């Protein structure tokens, strides 16, 4: 499910005028057809419009094409980053609004899509594409991006990461995110790694 900005990339159509969701079903032909028919009914009841299979079929063939991001990174001062987080269904709308708003000052394009979905929530990817004056400026921009992103995520009640891990960019905010669980994780790490040799400077440090 792609927001308007990323839908234009997913559809390879710079004039595409709405968010887009690609639907698929697995199983026997009859079962898959029945599932798709029901999904389309749900979409229609919520204002969606069936635009046919061409967009999804084209996307399937290029969904792992990262050349747009690679081209940005290969340019002098290019800035590209992916931020993935998660929240409940009731909270993800507020998180999306807060995070995309917080990122707009730092990028030429702010793209968003939902990826992994569950009964109780969903993960959100926000992709940033932009340009600084030089590599040093790009590095400084990335630090600003992560500070603003982490703040927006936590303030909106989301979790810092879905499945990519926290990494160094989120490390300063992990204690706040974990709350009282921080002490438990710290004690577990001390018990398993009393000499502090496993991935030093990361979780629990």
Describe each PLM feature range.
Residues 167-205:
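Activity-critical C-terminal alpha-helical subdomain
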Residues 127-131, 163-166, 203:
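Short, loop-centered acidic/histidine patches that primarily coordinate divalent metals
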Residues 137-141, 145, 166, 176, ...:
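Short amphipathic alpha-helical interaction segments
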Residues 148-159, 175-176, 187-190:
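Short basic/hydrophobic patches in alpha-helices and adjacent helix-turn junctions
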Residues 52-53, 162, 198-199:
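General beta-strand structural signal in soluble alpha/beta enzymes
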Residues 117-120, 160, 165-172:
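Small/polar glycine-rich anion-binding or flexible loop at a beta-alpha turn
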Residues 1-148, 152, 156:
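C-terminal substrate-recognition/cap domain of FAD-linked oxidoreductases
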């Amino acid at each position: 499910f792609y927001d308007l900005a990323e839908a234009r990339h997913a559809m390879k159509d710079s004039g595409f005028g709405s968010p887009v969701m690609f639907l698929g079903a697995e199983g026997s032909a009859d079962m898959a057809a029945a599932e798709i028919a029901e999904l389309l009914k749900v979409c229609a009841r919520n204002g969606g419009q069936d635009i046919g299979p061409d967009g999804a079929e084209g996307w399937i063939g290029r969904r792992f094409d990262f050349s747009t991001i690679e081209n940005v990174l290969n340019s002098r001062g290019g800035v590209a980053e992916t931020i993935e987080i998660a929240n409940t269904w009731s909270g993800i709308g507020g998180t999306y609004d807060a995070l995309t708003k917080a990122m707009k000052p730092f990028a030429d394009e702010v793209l968003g899509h939902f990826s992994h979905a569950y009964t109780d929530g969903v993960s959100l990817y926000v992709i940033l594409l932009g340009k600084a004056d030089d590599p040093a400026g790009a590095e400084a921009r990335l630090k600003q991006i992560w500070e603003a992103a982490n703040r927006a995520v936590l303030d909106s009640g989301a979790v810092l990461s879905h499945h990519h891990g926290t990494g160094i960019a989120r490390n300063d905010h992990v204690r706040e995110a974990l709350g009282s669980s921080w002490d438990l994780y710290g004690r577990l790490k001390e018990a398993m790694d009393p000499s502090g040799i496993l991935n030093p400077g990361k979780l629990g440090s």
